[in-house]
C-alpha cells in the first residue's frame, strides 16, 4: 500500500485528468444534503452519463494550479465542495443539478467550467435551460426528415392525379366504343 503522499498525488492526477477531459465541470456546496439526498443525486448523475464526486479543496487547488487555472477558479474551493463532470453532453450536469435544486435546498452552485472557461452560477442555470444533445439530434433529424416526407406526399399526389386522369380517359374511350 502506498504512502499518504502517493495517494494524494494519485488523487491530484485523477482530478486533473477528469478536469481536462470534461466538457463541463460544476462546483457546488453540498453541506446541506442528507446522505439520502446525496445518494439520489449521485444516481441522477449516473443516469445522465455524468460523474459527481467530492475532493479535498487543497488537492483540487494543486491540480487546478498545475493545469494553469488561477485564483479566479481556486477561490471557489472553500467549504464543502462537490464536483460534477460532464464528458459527452455539456448540458447534462447543469440540468441534473439545477433540477435537483428545485426540490432540495441543501445544495448550492458555486461556479463551473465549460470547455475550460470559467462560468458563473447564472451561466450554469442558463446552460441547464438548453436542450440536451439527444434533443438537438432529434430536432435536427426531424427537420431533415420533414422536406423528404413532404416531397413523397407531393410526388404521390401527382402520381395519383395522373392515374385518375388516365382512368378517366380510359373510361371515356370505353364509353365511346
From Swiss-Prot:
Keyword rRNA-binding part of the UniProt annotation: yes
Pfam families: Ribosomal_L10 (PF00466)
Gene3D superfamilies, per the entry: 3.30.70.1730, 6.10.250.290
GO biological process, one term: translation
InterPro entries: Ribosomal_uL10 (IPR001790), Ribosomal_uL10-like_sf (IPR043141), Ribosomal_uL10_bac (IPR022973), Ribosomal_uL10_bac_type (IPR047865), Ribosomal_uL10_CS_bac (IPR002363)
GO molecular function, one term: large ribosomal subunit rRNA binding
SUPFAM superfamilies: Ribosomal protein L10-like
Keyword RNA-binding: yes
GO cellular component, one term: large ribosomal subunit
CDD domains assigned to the protein according to its UniProt record, in alphabetical order: Ribosomal_L10
Keywords per UniProt: Ribonucleoprotein, Ribosomal protein, RNA-binding, rRNA-binding
Family (UniProt): Belongs to the universal ribosomal protein uL10 family.
Assembly: Part of the ribosomal stalk of the 50S ribosomal subunit. The N-terminus interacts with L11 and the large rRNA to form the base of the stalk. The C-terminus forms an elongated spine to which L12 dimers bind in a sequential fashion forming a multimeric L10(L12)X complex.
HAMAP family referenced in this protein's UniProt entry, alphabetically: Ribosomal_uL10
Function as written in the Swiss-Prot or TrEMBL entry: Forms part of the ribosomal stalk, playing a central role in the interaction of the ribosome with GTP-bound translation factors.
Official protein name in the record: Large ribosomal subunit protein uL10
